[in-house]
């Protein structure tokens, strides 16, 4: 009976969110589908792939073959916590990440399947239903992610429409933010930036990256392209000399994705990409949207940590508690300066590298001159 009610509730929630997403998509002529069809198809694939990552980890966690890997991962996470790292290696934690992971062929097989998913074509309805259909997510989590994705699609459509001015785009973004906040407040992440501790130092932090480096690399690469392609679109409108750079971001993305098993000469991000680091133009032109998208990306990664954490009891309850922390306007709030510092502290290179400029190695703890850094970044504080 409980399962039936849950299925009905998720179906109803999914239907209402599908209507919301469709209304956003239909409101923008000359949007992403018209101007950048390859990106639009990839964004559909990203939703299906992300839900697939969650479900794949949940399935591996239940597989008896993974028992040794789960024990090793739990010991590793416990050891890090005892070393007073707050349950997380902090920014730059990718330096200690075992690229072979803890689940061997199980993760490799999942990565191969998900690599095919991200390369496939997926309808709007498949994308809209992806989170609702995920068995690893709760009703609340799937609803928040789906409503968040509808907002992101609105943002991408607005900026992709080259028939409107920057000012008109900013006004349209303001309306999209209001719609996002008011359409179903229970399913909206906070409009205020969240503290780094909420993402980096929660009890289950690092389980995703340490346990599943191939899957985390894929998720972070997908998040990187969403921000990097948006940076290329916006900066081409702000300064025409940088126009036509979307194909470059696509090339860099596919280099990060690499082979079916995730092997590549161009490393995937080891840190979650953030808007100020990868798309400074988004923060300059639409700081509120930047914060919402970063909160959503943080939530997506934190959910992956909870799902990846081995042998966790009451996982559904933990997921809903986590979601509530991101939707709350009272808990774990950061001021603007801390938000920017936290976004940049992990390093642009570790977050996947710049959208347009060149950065061949980590810039952390080194000066721009020492790096010979050529990174196109035009970011100003919001008015």
Enumerate the predicted regions with their spans.
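Bacterial N-terminal signal peptides that target proteins for export
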Residues: 2-12
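Bacterial N-terminal signal peptides
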Residues: 12-22
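Long, helix-rich interaction regions
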Residues: 22-23, 383
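...the same signal can extend to comparable exposed beta-sheet modules
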Residues: 1-2, 27, 314-317, 337, ...
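Intrinsically disordered, low-complexity segments enriched in Gly and acidic/Ser/Thr residues
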Residues: 254-352
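N-terminal Sec/ER secretory leader and immediately downstream segment
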Residues: 28-253, 319, 334, 351-383
């Amino acid at each position: 009976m409980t399962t039936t009610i849950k299925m009905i509730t998720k179906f109803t929630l999914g239907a209402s969110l599908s209507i919301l997403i469709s209304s956003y998509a239909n409101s923008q002529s000359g949007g992403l589908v018209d101007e950048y069809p390859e990106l639009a198809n990839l964004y559909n694939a990203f939703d299906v792939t992300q839900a697939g990552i969650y479900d794949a980890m949940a399935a591996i966690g239940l597989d008896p073959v993974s028992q040794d890997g789960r024990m090793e991962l739990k010991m590793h996470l416990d050891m890090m916590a005892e070393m007073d790292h707050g349950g997380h290696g902090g920014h730059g934690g990718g330096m200690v990440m075992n690229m072979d992971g803890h689940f061997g062929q199980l993760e490799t097989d999942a990565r191969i399947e998900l690599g095919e998913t991200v390369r496939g074509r997926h309808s709007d309805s498949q994308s809209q239903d992806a989170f609702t259909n995920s068995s690893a997510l709760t009703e609340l989590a799937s609803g928040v992610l789906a409503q968040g994705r509808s907002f992101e699609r609105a943002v991408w459509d607005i900026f992709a429409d080259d028939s409107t001015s920057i000012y008109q785009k900013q006004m349209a973004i303001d309306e999209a933010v209001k719609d996002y906040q008011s359409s179903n407040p229970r399913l909206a992440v906070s409009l205020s930036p969240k503290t780094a501790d909420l993402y980096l130092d929660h009890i289950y932090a690092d389980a995703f990256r340490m346990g599943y480096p191939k899957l985390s690399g894929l998720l972070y690469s997908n998040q990187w392209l969403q921000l990097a392609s948006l940076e290329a679109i916006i900066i081409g409108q702000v300064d025409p000399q940088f126009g036509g750079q979307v194909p470059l971001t696509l090339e860099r993305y596919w280099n990060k994705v690499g082979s079916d098993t995730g092997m590549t000469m161009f490393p995937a991000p080891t840190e979650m990409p953030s808007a100020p680091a990868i798309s400074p133009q988004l923060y300059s032109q639409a700081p509120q949207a930047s914060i919402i998208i970063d909160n959503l990306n943080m939530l997506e990664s934190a959910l992956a940590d909870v799902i990846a954490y081995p042998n966790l009891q009451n996982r559904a309850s933990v997921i809903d508690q986590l979601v509530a922390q991101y939707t709350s306007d009272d808990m774990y709030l950061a001021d603007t300066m801390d938000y920017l510092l936290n976004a940049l502290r992990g390093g642009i290179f570790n977050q996947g590298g710049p959208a347009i400029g060149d950065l061949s190695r980590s810039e952390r703890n080194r000066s721009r001159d020492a790096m010979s850094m050529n990174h196109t970044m035009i970011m100003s504080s919001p008015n």
